[in-house]
Every structure is written in C-alpha cells, then in structure tokens.
Amino acid sequence: MSASPLLGMSRREFLTKLTGAGAAAFLMDWAAPVIEKAYGAGPCPGHLTDIEHIVLLMQENRSFDHYFGTLSSTNGFNAASPAFQQMGWNPMTQALDPAGVTIPFRLDTTRGPFLDGECVNDPEHQWVGMHLAWNGGANDNWLPAQATTRAGPYVPLTMGYYTRQDIPIHYLLADTFTICDGYHCSLLTGTLPNRLYWLSANIDPAGTDGGPQLVEPGFLPLQQFSWRIMPENLEDAGVSWKVYQNKGLGRFINTPISNNGLVQAFRQAADPRSNLARYGIAPTYPGDFAADVRANRLPKVSWLVPNILQSEHPALPVALGAVSMVTALRILLSNPAVWEKTALIVSYDENGGFFDHVTPPTAPPGTPGEFVTVPNIDAVPGSGGIRGPLGLGFRVPCIVISPYSRGPLMVSDTFDHTSQLKLIRARFGVPVPNMTAWRDGVVGDMTSAFNFATPPNSTRPNLSHPLLGALPKLPQCIPNVVLGTTDGALPSIPYRVPYPQVMPTQETTPVRGTPSGLCS
C-alpha cells in the first residue's frame, strides 16, 4: 500500500497545496469534512501535525529534585521516600560519618560572595559514581559515592537544591508551560555519553563503531565514532534539520564549548562538503538560528548548543542558564508565524551528581543493547569494571515550551533523551533504529506533554530577559568556576551544610493540570 499523501503534512500545508492547484470553492467546501476527518479534528483544536518545528535545547548537569523538588504538584520533596535520608555525612560535625544522615538542603543564592549557593561545584557524576549512588536500585549510596572522588566538605553538595527565589525564571517557565517530572537522563553517567544518546540513541556498548563511550573525556573526540546518528535518518527521509552551536572557546573540556559540537565526533561527517558537515557542524548559535527563524527557513528539527557560560554547568551561575532558555524562546517569539507551530524542548544532559529521590527504571541483566558487551570491560576508559545497566539515569528537568503546552501543566510519564527522538518519529515518521527494544517499550514519545484538546495559545509569555540580573553573579563565582570545572582536581570553596536540618516542602500553588496529549 502506498503512503498517504497527507502523511507528514499539516492542515495548513494541505489547504495551501489544494488552493494552489486552482481548486474551485465548491471543491473546498466538499473536501473540508474529509480533510478534518483525516486529521482527527473532532473536538480537538490541535494536532501533532500542527507542530512543524521541533527545537531541542539541552543544558548541563542538574537533577529534578535539585531544581524542582519544591515545585507544586510534582513528584518532589513531599513524596514519601526513604531516599531523602542519605547516610555518610554528619551535618552537626560537618564531617564524614558512616552513621551521619543528611537530607536535602537549600543552596541559598542570596548569601553573597564566598557563601553563595549560586556557585557550588560539580559533584561526582561519572559512570562509576552514579552506579555507586544507584546501588543496584536501592538509591541509598549518594554520599559514599561522592566520597570516592571528593574531599570531605564537598561530599554533601550532592544533596543541595534550589527554590523559586534562587531560579525564578526556571520556575516561571515551569508555571507557563508543561513540566515533565518523569524525565530521566538516558544513562547512569556524565555529559558526552548522554549527549550521544540525545543525538543517536547509542554509545556503542558492543564496541564495534568507536565505543563504548562511558565517561566524559577531557576533549571531545574528533571523528572517533561511526555509528548512525539521527541526522542521517532525517536526511534519508527528506526531513530538514540543523545543529546550531556556539563557536566560542574551542575544543575544551565539555561538549557545550566544543567549537564544532557532537557531529564532528563522527567519521561520516569528516567531509566538509557533506550534508552532515554543512548542517551539523557549520551552523552557528544564536546567529544562524535567529536568522533562519526571521527568514522562515527554520528546519523541521533543530538541536541548539549554547556557549559554556550559559550551560548551567557547575560552578557557573544557575541564573545564566535562564539567559540561555529565554534567548532561545525570544528568538522563536520574534517570528509569530514560526512560534505558533513550534515546540521547544528544554532538557538537561545528566543530573550532574546531584541527588534525586526517584530510582530510575533499569534493564534486567542481559538485555540486548543495555549492557556493555566488549570482551575486556577493564580496558574501557572509566568503566571501573561495571558493565551496566546503561540506564535509565536519574531524573533531570525538562520543560516543553509551545503554544500547545501552555500551563501550568505537568506530565509524569517516563521519558528520557530518546523520547525526544521518538517525538520526531511520531511527528515525521523517521525511524530511530539505534533504540533498544527494551527502552522503546519503557519511555514515551512526549506527545502526552502537549495539550491538543485546548486551543493553542501563541501569545507572548510574560518573561523579562534575565541577563542584567545574572551578570553580577558571575564575578562572585569566578573562584569556583576556575577550580570547579576540573572535576575536583583542585580545591574550591565548599558550601556548609545547614544545621539543624529541616526537610523541605513543596509549594502549594499553582495547581498543575494534566495535558491531553493526542486526542480525537
């Protein structure tokens, strides 16, 4: 059976093509009910096909509880969970203590230089550390896991969290659109492996195509990998795409500040004349992204990679992360014709070693594609002899920003980075062949994050630009920025755990609704 000519076409596109063919008015009247039925119009004012652009923005190193544990209506600090009491640090003595108990504590951003929770450093968050924290699913070993690589005063930082007062723009975005409280990073490890999953749903656990990539290297590899990536699937399907990335600071430390981004790590992008290089390496952010939005040439799928200062990687100010999100949103809002048919998904690559009380779903031993299967596991950098499971990893923040996801809304379905690829599959019919059968059955496709049963609201959200408020915070973070991006290799300024301890609670308002998802 041949594919329907309606497949992948919005109602607007169909009508344009029909009128462009010179169809008479009576034909339009006759065809309208058929067209509406084809799109399942019924009582639904919106449909997945109305979203013509999917824009993916990924930030750095924050867990859900760390950012949104106090947010109303979500699976946060009000949950009944023994995981909130982690053993290994004594807040009264401010010392390592196997019998000591630490609960989540606020990282207060109002205390000024050298005391400021804005500038805390990176907890341990690589493959070994996150598997130790997960502890076979017990989720009870966060502090001892930190103590394997961090000196005493830095161990309890894993339990720190922020409130609305500390990250007001993040909370405002969560109130204005759909927050996902069941969104996980893909892997129990750090940045590069999770970003590879975001781009390709793979880290090559069998070691046949340049992997396995289990940890974050000091430098982004050049043309190391050769497995198929999602842009190639889009290319073959004729679906337009680009990776827009900031070009500043060169190939140094973390993926967000690589001058050529993730695609350059693949051998098939080595030819600068190839479409992988033209669309996956050359486009700049925010310059080319803004130009394409203005000119109505935004591709169907876009990946955004801002500069390091706006990535929210500890010890950079969390306030600068708001600059990144608002900048992307403002660019989209600058062209209402683009904004009204766009979904911007803001997620975080990994939890950054910050605590989350929800134990992630993980694959049973032996699940194909979900464990490292190279013969010599000890030869894999950073493996610590651990074969898996690969994931899911711990929860991270995710906000779905679109006229079709105006909030306050919350969805609790289980998602991970491959869910973004599944959304692309659902909307444009492009396969995700790297995804394992187990993962495909566990995580959703994010269509449930949209409220298609309600008319879209494309009015401009009331968001002031946070740049002026964020810039003064940067100088007070400089000591920890310099020392804290070295994965604990140099001593930085610790944050003292408050004592006595008080378990945090969640806000009571706003009450969040549940989006309709697809409807008919």
From Swiss-Prot:
- Further details from the record: Polymorphism was discovered in the phospholipase plcA/B/C region. Some strains seem to lack both plcA and plcB genes, while others lack only plcB. An IS6110 insertion element has been found in strain LCDC-194, interrupting the plcA gene.
- Thermal activity profile: Optimum temperature is 37 degrees Celsius.
An example GO biological process term is:
symbiont-mediated disruption of host cellular anatomical structure
- EC no. given is 3.1.4.3
Name under which the protein is recorded: Phospholipase C A
Q: Name one GO molecular function term.
A: phospholipase C activity
What function does this protein fulfil?
Answer: Involved in virulence. Induces cytotoxic effects on mouse macrophage cell lines, via direct or indirect enzymatic hydrolysis of cell membrane phospholipids. Hydrolyzes phosphatidylcholine and sphingomyelin. Does not have hemolytic activity.
- CC terms in the record's Gene Ontology section: extracellular region
What broad class describes the main subcellular location of this protein? secreted
UniProt keyword terms in alphabetical order: Cell wall, Hydrolase, Secreted, Signal, Virulence
A Pfam family recorded for this sequence: Phosphoesterase
**Where in or outside the cell?**
Secreted, Cell wall
Catalytic activity as recorded in UniProt:
a 1,2-diacyl-sn-glycero-3-phosphocholine + H2O = phosphocholine + a 1,2-diacyl-sn-glycerol + H(+); a sphingomyelin + H2O = phosphocholine + an N-acylsphing-4-enine + H(+); 1,2-dihexadecanoyl-sn-glycero-3-phosphocholine + H2O = 1,2-dihexadecanoyl-sn-glycerol + phosphocholine + H(+)
What is the induction comment? Constitutively expressed. Expression is induced in vitro in the presence of phosphatidylcholine. Also induced upon infection of THP-1 macrophages.
